[in-house]
């Protein structure tokens, strides 16, 4: 009996000690839980910002080297390869990269409703429109150099900045503030000023075909970009690689039709990869990675960010050209760079405030 009383007293002492310590422990536990949630939220926000930054930087770097690779892929002033097969190769490579990314997702997360390839007709039926628009725009990108030189092309390319802003307002019904509209105008002025040099006078002598192609490219680029963003963001939880896969599948189909219509005999007689060089392969790889980067910018940022990325890339191209081609950067370039920097800042701080 005495032994039992001793054991009961020991048990009581242990329980009492736990009761004394438990309020502090519960407080510490609660604080730890709150801290963990705050850390998780901050980590998620940091990761999101990091992803946006990486994708935007990648798009800027890829776009800045795009024009250089297109020019380098020429031989004796012309393309010895078929531009339709090059476009098809770009779409095929993008499709392959999307499948590889999906395969890794399936291995790590399993197949879910949001990352499975199977889809409904309603979902997939919207992809042919941007696919055919991108195909035409990409083909025009090669042919416009028959009518304009590189500086003139860079200046005319700024037309898509305005078309994107207008279509962004019309299609996505998203309001742009007066400051943002002013930023668009400044951006056009800045990019144009930065590209001015003695040869830029040729832009006034550009044949009507060159002007028409530049305007059509601007409209196609703006409409396809905004329309694609609307599709991608319509179902935010949908895996971006699944959305890309279906867009690129239709891109392959339309480019295959273009090959049959335009270069069928040449491909049959000389081969699909006739005239390809190492620079051509680099150009195709660049276009493929650029396309994926654009879609990720649309998914995790917006099409306006894409426009500013490509605009900054134009200035980067000019800087790189100093080392590659010995180009001289005039005062106009530095003035234009300053104006572009100001426009980027105005666009960032001029976003419409949500109504309370």
Swiss-Prot record:
Transmembrane segment boundaries: 53-73, 83-103, 126-146, 150-172, 176-196, 212-232, 240-260, 278-298, 315-335
Residue intervals on the Cytoplasmic side: 1-52, 104-125, 173-175, 233-239, 299-314
Subcellular location: Golgi apparatus membrane
UniProt-recorded Gene Ontology molecular function terms: pyrimidine nucleotide-sugar transmembrane transporter activity; transmembrane transporter activity
Chain positions covered by the region annotation Disordered: 1-44
GO CC terms, sorted: Golgi membrane
Origin superkingdom: Eukaryota
Keywords assigned: Golgi apparatus, Membrane, Sugar transport, Transmembrane, Transmembrane helix, Transport
Membrane side Lumenal: residue ranges: 74-82, 147-149, 197-211, 261-277, 336-356
Topology versus the membrane: Multi-pass membrane protein
Tissue: Expressed in roots, leaves and stalks.
Bias-annotated ranges (Low complexity): 27-44
Pfam families, per the entry: Nuc_sug_transp
Family: Belongs to the nucleotide-sugar transporter family. CMP-Sialate:CMP antiporter (TC 2.A.7.12) subfamily.
Function: Sugar transporter involved in the transport of CMP-sialic acid from the cytoplasm into the Golgi. May transport important nucleotide sugars such as CMP-Kdo (2-keto-3-deoxy-D-manno-octulosonic acid) in physiological conditions.
Protein name: CMP-sialic acid transporter 2
Natural source organism: Oryza sativa subsp. japonica (Rice)
């Amino acid at each position: 009996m005495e032994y039992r009383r001793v054991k009961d007293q020991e048990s009581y002492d242990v329980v009492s000690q736990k009761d004394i310590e438990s309020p502090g422990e519960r407080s510490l536990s609660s604080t730890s839980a709150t801290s963990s949630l705050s850390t998780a939220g901050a980590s998620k926000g940091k990761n999101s910002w990091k992803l946006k930054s990486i994708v935007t930087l990648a798009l800027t770097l890829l776009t800045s080297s795009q024009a250089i690779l297109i020019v380098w892929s020429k031989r004796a002033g012309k393309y010895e390869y078929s531009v339709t097969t090059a476009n098809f190769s770009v779409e095929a490579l993008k499709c392959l990269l999307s499948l590889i990314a999906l395969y890794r997702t399936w291995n790590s997360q399993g197949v879910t409703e949001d990352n499975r390839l199977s889809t409904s007709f309603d979902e997939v039926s919207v992809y042919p429109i941007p696919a055919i628009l991108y195909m035409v725009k990409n083909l025009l990108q090669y042919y416009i150099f028959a009518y304009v030189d590189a500086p003139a092309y860079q200046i005319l390319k700024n037309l898509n900045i305005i078309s994107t802003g207008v279509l962004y307002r019309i299609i996505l019904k998203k309001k742009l503030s007066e400051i943002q509209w002013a930023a668009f105008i400044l951006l056009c002025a800045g990019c144009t000023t930065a590209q001015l040099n003695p040869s830029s006078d040729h832009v006034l002598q550009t044949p009507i075909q060159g002007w028409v192609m530049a305007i059509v490219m601007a409209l196609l680029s703006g409409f396809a970009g905004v329309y694609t963003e609307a599709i991608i963001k319509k179902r935010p939880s949908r895996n971006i690689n699944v959305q890309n896969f279906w867009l690129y599948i239709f891109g392959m189909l339309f480019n295959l039709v273009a090959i049959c219509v335009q270069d069928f005999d040449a491909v049959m007689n000389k081969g699909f990869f006739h005239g390809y060089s190492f620079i051509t392969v680099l150009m195709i790889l660049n276009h493929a990675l650029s396309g994926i980067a654009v879609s990720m910018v649309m998914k995790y940022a917006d099409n306006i960010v894409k426009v500013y990325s490509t605009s900054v890339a134009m200035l980067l191209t000019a800087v790189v050209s100093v080392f590659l081609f010995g180009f001289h950067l005039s005062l106009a370039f530095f003035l234009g760079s300053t104006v572009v920097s100001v426009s980027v800042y105005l666009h960032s701080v001029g976003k419409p405030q949500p109504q309370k």
